[in-house]
């Protein structure tokens, strides 16, 4: 199977998000890479489902709360930018203060 670098990146994000989801389900607080991966994957999947950029900008702030992450992680992520594939092309989704 031949994958482009972009496809490999998407799979890596999905795998990290899956791991983060499992750890969160076990009651563990997420670290920086896990939190970023989980929020990023949610945005990418929302785009694939046909949601709008505005909807995803809002939904990106509801994926995780401060109680879901280790101390200091929320402050380390002032924004997340995701280049997501929508039905009408690729767009940049920026989520400001994703963990509140």
UniProtKB/Swiss-Prot annotation:
EC numbers for this chain: 3.5.1.5
HAMAP family noted in UniProt: Urease_gamma
Pathway noted in the entry: Nitrogen metabolism; urea degradation; CO(2) and NH(3) from urea (urease route): step 1/1
UniProt catalytic activity: urea + 2 H2O + H(+) = hydrogencarbonate + 2 NH4(+)
Native organism taxonomy: Bacteria, Pseudomonadati, Pseudomonadota, Betaproteobacteria, Burkholderiales
Subunit structure: Heterotrimer of UreA (gamma), UreB (beta) and UreC (alpha) subunits. Three heterotrimers associate to form the active enzyme.
Gene designation per UniProt: ureA
Protein's name according to its UniProt entry: Urease subunit gamma
Annotated NCBIfam families: PRK13241.1, urease_gam
Similarity section: Belongs to the urease gamma subunit family.
UniProt enzyme class: hydrolase
Keyword Hydrolase: yes
The entry's keywords: Cytoplasm, Hydrolase
Subcellular location: Cytoplasm
Cellular-component GO terms for this entry: cytoplasm
Pfam families named among the record's database cross-references: Urease_gamma (PF00547)
């Amino acid at each position: 199977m031949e994958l482009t670098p972009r496809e490999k990146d998407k799979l890596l994000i999905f795998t990290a998000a899956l791991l983060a989801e499992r750890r969160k389900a076990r009651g563990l607080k997420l670290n920086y890479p896990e939190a970023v991966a989980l929020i990023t994957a949610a945005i990418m999947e929302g785009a694939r489902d046909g949601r709008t950029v505005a909807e995803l900008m809002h939904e990106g702030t509801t994926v995780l709360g401060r109680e879901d992450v280790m101390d200091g992680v929320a402050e380390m992520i002032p924004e997340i930018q995701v280049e997501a594939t929508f039905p009408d092309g690729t767009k940049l989704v920026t989520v400001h203060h994703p963990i509140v």
